Amino acid sequence: MERNIKEEGKFRYVEIGEGTPIIILHGLMGGLSNFDGVSDYFPKKGYKVVLPELPIYTLNILKTNIKAFAKFVHDFVKHKKYEKIILLGNSLGGHIALYYTKMHPESVEALIITGSSGLYESAMGDSYPRRGDYEFIKKKAEDVFYDPAVATKEIVDDVFTTVNDRIKLI
């Protein structure tokens, strides 16, 4: 689903609904579109869903770490003047959410993590993603979800583009 991305200073984000903010942090190869179901569901239940675009590929390589990403989230929360948030993080976003919550527990009403780094995960097996092999990436993307149909062509294309972009290589 296409969303209107707001830009305010260094922040790019999608914001849907009114109420207690649920800030959703995407993973390393994730994007805002990964959360279409969540962003459609929770505003109807009285929540504001906020999906900031993390600066994963735009930060200086020496500042590309969990602590810097958590600071970015903290700056975003202050920018939006949120007092209490629900924080939901997936994969790398889960790791960032854990660190943020440790550093700023007073502002986190609830924490939800899925597939957070640091937890056992075997989606890529014991190998690295193979560049240029679309079918390999498609299969691995399908393995991430309980229902492989969730790994739409758009999601697979996004992961394939990221894996094959040497500038985004971390």
Each language-model region and where it sits:
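N-terminal cap/lid segment of alpha/beta-hydrolase-fold proteins
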Residues: M1-K10
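Flexible "cap/lid" loop of the alpha/beta hydrolase fold
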Residues: L98-M103, V108-K139
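Conserved HGGG/HGGXW glycine-rich cap/lid loop of the alpha/beta-hydrolase fold
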Residues: R12-L59
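Conserved alpha/beta-hydrolase catalytic His-Asp/Glu region
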Residues: R131-I170
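Structural signature of beta-strand start/N-cap positions in the alpha/beta core
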Residues: P21, K48, E83-I86, S107-A110
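Gly/Ala-rich beta-loop-alpha elbow adjacent to hydrolase catalytic centers
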Residues: G89, G93, A97
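Active-site loop/oxyanion-hole signature of alpha/beta-hydrolase fold enzymes
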Residues: S39, K44, V50-L88
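Short, hydrophobic alpha-helix immediately C-terminal to the catalytic nucleophile
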Residues: D36, H74, L98-K102
